[in-house]
Every structure is written in structure tokens, then in C-alpha cells.
Amino acid sequence: CYLTFDDGPSDNTLLILEILRKYGIKATFFVINSEKLDYVKNIYEAGHTVGLHSATHNYGEIYKSTQAYLDDLKVISDRVESIIGIAPKVMRFPGGSSNSVSRKYCAGVMSSLTRAVEELGYSYYDWNVSSGDALSETPSFTYIRNNVLKGARDKNSACVLMHDSDTKTTTVKALPEIIEGLMKMGYSFEPITPEAYGYHHNTLN
């Protein structure tokens, strides 16, 4: 099982790291150019995977062309490299490769981007279990927990989408029960690496 957290680092990052430490679990953080970006050092030094997400997470800007997203990706890559000394080669598109929002700005851009990032040596990862914590209102921790445990049931491998932004306090609250529930299902936990199985959605552009 791969636990993944998008949109951090945030005020919740250190809390998430402490929970993961308690359970002896490594996870993956797909980061943006946030005010708390220095926390990528904490993530990296704790043995988790730092992945790239976006510098701005502004759909209208990053998805207006293939080059626009690649330029944005370079910004966050350079920032992360300046902090931890390496440029990550794993990444996740905002909204995933199956997002339908991008076609409002540039039809076909996701098909172009999935090829372009791989040509640049990146491995991109979507997910096959969603926590549902991306709702505009903060969902309850039971809703988040139940989504993950129901979604992971009867799967051979799970890649769980969660979020690490300032408002996601209920994700933090749900995390211990998510981990314990997944353990009871027999899951072990690993961080994503470029060699990991690629969870790819169908592009909808």
C-alpha cells in the first residue's frame, strides 16, 4: 500500500510525520511551492519519498499548454532540490492525469503531458483509492476513514490519495484508524519510487 499526500507541506505535515513514525511507515508527499516548503527536509530526512506536484496548482495557468506545466514543474523541482539536494523524479499531476478541467484551457494537454514528463525522465502516479478529503468543506474523519478502507478492500495493491494542506485536520485525525484498518487487511506500506507500479488513469482531455 502506498499512502500519498498532495498539496503540502502545511501546518499538518509534522503531525502526519509523527503518526507515520509511530507506526513505522514510509509514505509519499507530492508537494507544492507552499509557505512551509522547508518541511520537505523533514519529510526527506524521515525516509519518505518527496514527489513533485506543482508550484502554483493554478489549473488555468499550468494547463494552458504543455510547456506551461513543464515550466511550473521545473520551478517546484528547483525549489525542492535547493532544500534536499536532489531533484525528485516522481510526480503527480494536479487533479490526476484523468482530470477533465484541463480541457477547458487546452484540449488534449494531458495526453501531451503524460508523454512529455516521461520523456524528461519522470514517473507519474495517480491513485486507485481516494479518501474524498478534497471536498471544499472539511469532511468528517469517519467519512475519510471509511472511503479509504472501503476503497482498499479486495485490492491486491492500493495507492491512497490524501491531502496535506492546512485545512485537512480531519485527514490527520483519520490517519491512525486508516493505517490500523489497512494493516488488518494485510497491507504493508512502502514509499513510491520510480520503479514502483505506475497507477495511471485514462486521460480525459
Model-derived features with residue positions:
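Active-site beta->alpha N-cap acidic-glycine motif
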Residues: 1-88, 181, 197
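Catalytic domains of cell-wall/extracellular-matrix polysaccharide-remodeling enzymes
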Residues: 15, 59-161, 165-183, 187-188, ...
